Amino acid sequence: MIENSDYMELSFKKPSKNVREAMCQASLDLGNREIETAHKRNAEESLKDLTHHQHARIVNSGNSAIMIAMSNIKGPVLLPDQGVWAGFKKIAEFLGLKIEYLPTNQGIIDLEILDNYIKITTPESLFITSFAGYMAEQPVKEIFELCDRRGVILVEDASGSIGDPQKNLACGDHAHIIVASTGSPKIINLGNGGFISTNDPEIFKKSNYILKSSRISPVICAGMVEAIKKAPYSLSKTLQACNFLKKEIGTVLFEEYRGINVTLPSENPKQMGRELRKRIPVEGGGMISTCPRYDRIKQPAVCLEIKNLDIKCLKKDNLREISDITNNITSNYFI
């Protein structure tokens, strides 16, 4: 259930109290090799339990995790034409990998089109995000089954879906490799770091130098153990909040899909975004983004980035006020 509140007070997501306390304690233990090693080991074991993968490594960013995954691939790399992290393209270009783009339905992958494009482009890998543009859940299990049959490595960026209670997303049963950022304001929110998990240990052997160059502080590892415990709750509350807003706001995209933001079509997204930012302030950050943009959707729209908000803000009265303000402003901008 979504909780009640007396008034709207929104704040940008930050690491939880338990996470901050664990990180503070770990900082006091710096220099003790035995304790530092234990923090790293415990975090990696927690990640393996969460992802259902046999191997996991914690690194200094989500992009480092992507770099490790791509360094094991000779190409071509298949990317959706929208709705995925722009870092996929930049890192593939940096590594000199050939990129092919998969046509999608507003970021959502159609399995028949995917099958045809695999036959045409013969990619070695497909990189996706669990939610297309954070907006709509991809059919990850079905994508994985198709890729597995065709000999294509599926890499899932699960930054926004880790801890999925339904086990459809961020699950090693449905991805050859999982990568994620644990920076702010991700589901596992440590303000820094990332991870990569897989059942194939050769991936880490082949990228040993990058792994060494991407080592993370044991302070982050200590925080990760605590943050992982809260990941299913954090994701569930965010999904519930988005589902509530999709029902309350007049016109939204992907109403029937799970997602961690709410996207509104608009004839003038920049102006509409400015008005929403004025009326829906967020302490310490923001929650409004505008499209078209590759990592969301390639059409004029405004996104309410509910994923950016601290979980404590996702109370019914806050959400109702967000929906009322949004409905009032957006009536002049819907396409």
Model regions and ranges:
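PLP-dependent enzyme catalytic core of the Aspartate aminotransferase-like
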Residues: M1-N18, A22, Y294-I335
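Conserved N-terminal alpha-helix of the aminotransferase class I/II PLP-enzyme fold
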Residues: I2-S64, Q82-K90, K167, A231, ...
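Conserved PLP-anchoring active-site segment centered on the Schiff-base-forming lysine
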Residues: A69-K119
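Short, conserved charged micro-motifs
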Residues: V77, F204, N268-R277, I311-I322
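Active-site phosphate-binding strand-loop segment of PLP-dependent enzymes
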Residues: Q106-L169, A175-I177, S184-I187, P201-E202
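Active-site PLP attachment segment
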Residues: D173-S207, P218-C221
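Amphipathic alpha-helix from the class-I
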Residues: C221-K237, G250
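Conserved glycine-rich beta-strand-loop-beta hairpin in the small C-terminal domain of fold type I
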Residues: L239-N243, L253-I280, I288-V302
